[in-house]
Amino acid sequence: MKLDQVAKSLLLKEFVSGMILGMRYFFKPKATINYPFEMGHRGPRFRGEHALRRYPNGEERCIACKLCEAICPAQAITIEAGPRRNDGTRRTTRYDIDMVKCIYCGMCQEACPVDAIVEGPNFEFSVETREELLYDKQKLLLNGDRWEREIARNIAMDAPYR
């Protein structure tokens, strides 16, 4: 063995440098949070549970253009459009999302011309059966009604970058 290797092993250089590193982090603030009791910050572009939004007058925003269905890479969205109404607009009769297939990429949200389908701030939506992850139009509208305030705030914060 060379002299420098003997000196390193006798002086425990690696052990001492590890202890110094550990002590440096010991006195810094914690980097973790106690999750169920503390919530971390979620930015305005956070992608959580899907929601269908309504206009302030209560009418649903979706115009049945089917762009979200076409762009979805996982083919998780199924839409059926109703007949045209007297004013020339269409609405959906069926809007289903298979949340098991969804990869939360946000492309449906980007493709929507009227901001009808969004990925909201909710990420705590665990279920016990697979069938509960098949969202229909009513479930999506309820999510939109429940999270509308946060969704509108996030869209407004992100608007300059769109």
UniProtKB/Swiss-Prot annotation:
It catalyses: a quinone + NADH + 5 H(+)(in) = a quinol + NAD(+) + 4 H(+)(out). InterPro entries: 4Fe4S_Fe-S-bd (IPR017896), 4Fe4S_Fe_S_CS (IPR017900), NADH_quinone_OxRdtase_chainI (IPR010226). It is found in: Cell inner membrane. One of its GO terms (molecular function) is NADH:ubiquinone reductase (non-electrogenic) activity. PROSITE patterns: 4FE4S_FER_1, 4FE4S_FER_2. GO terms for biological process: aerobic respiration. It is an enzyme of class 7 (translocase). [4Fe-4S] cluster 2 binds at residues 72, 102, 105, 108. Residues 52-82, 93-122 form the 4Fe-4S ferredoxin-type domain. Binds 2 [4Fe-4S] clusters per subunit. It is a peripheral membrane protein. Its EC number is 7.1.1.-. NDH-1 is composed of 14 different subunits. Subunits NuoA, H, J, K, L, M, N constitute the membrane sector of the complex. PANTHER family: NADH DEHYDROGENASE [UBIQUINONE] IRON-SULFUR PROTEIN 8, MITOCHONDRIAL (PTHR10849:SF20), NADH DEHYDROGENASE UBIQUINONE IRON-SULFUR PROTEIN 8, MITOCHONDRIAL (PTHR10849). Belongs to the complex I 23 kDa subunit family. This is NADH-quinone oxidoreductase subunit I. It comes from Methylobacterium radiotolerans (strain ATCC 27329 / DSM 1819 / JCM 2831 / NBRC 15690 / NCIMB 10815 / 0-1).
